[in-house]
Amino acid sequence: MPDTIAAIATASAAAAVGIVRLSGAETRCVLAALFTPVDGRSAAELPPRRMTYGTVRDAEGRTLDHALAVVFSAGHSYTGEESAELHCHGSPVVLQEVLRAAFAAGARQARAGEFTERAFLNGKMDLTEAEAVIDLIDAETAEAARNAAAQVDGALRRPLEQVYDALLGLTSRFYAVVDYPDEDIEDLTLAETERTLTESLSLIHI
């Protein structure tokens, strides 16, 4: 995934604050082309996870907004890549102009769900957690939101990992006994198999 993506991360309605998000290897270069910190530093030198105030400009040097920028180092961001956010005034027109400036600086439009896709591909979340992000966004009740948030936090992943480990151990023992009958390997009993399967089913509430 060599390209750097950009998108508006907040709703398309007017609000006090709107966010433009960047992710990819060239994030700092794109950010440096857009954003000038108030202290005159290059945006490429910003420390991670610290808000910095400055000016957002387009390729012609015209001021688009005064905003806060924050960068996240690869491995410590939502996507697992070098990432950044520009917290601008929440006018849809302003956000679109900032996004166009990001494209002019080398980013491309992110596909729907691509930030979460990259998080999944980079090992920042598994498939259950990635799907839960969608459920959390689409939640229409407080209970649905709580359930989705728990899954994002690994509530489904952890028991599935336990089930996977238990079944892997079971099948490994089975194949060892079958493939090496002359070795001193303890037979896998029916009772042990039933106990492992019952415990596994209870973990996933089937």
Where are the model-predicted features located?
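A glycine-rich (often HGG/GG-containing) alpha/beta subdomain
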Residues: M1-R146, A150, G154
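Extended, Lys/Glu-rich alpha-helical coiled-coil stalks
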Residues: I134, A150-G169
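Charged, amphipathic alpha-helical linker segments immediately N-terminal to NTP-binding catalytic cores
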Residues: L160-E199
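Conserved small/polar residues in nucleotide/adenosyl-binding loops
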Residues: I204-I206
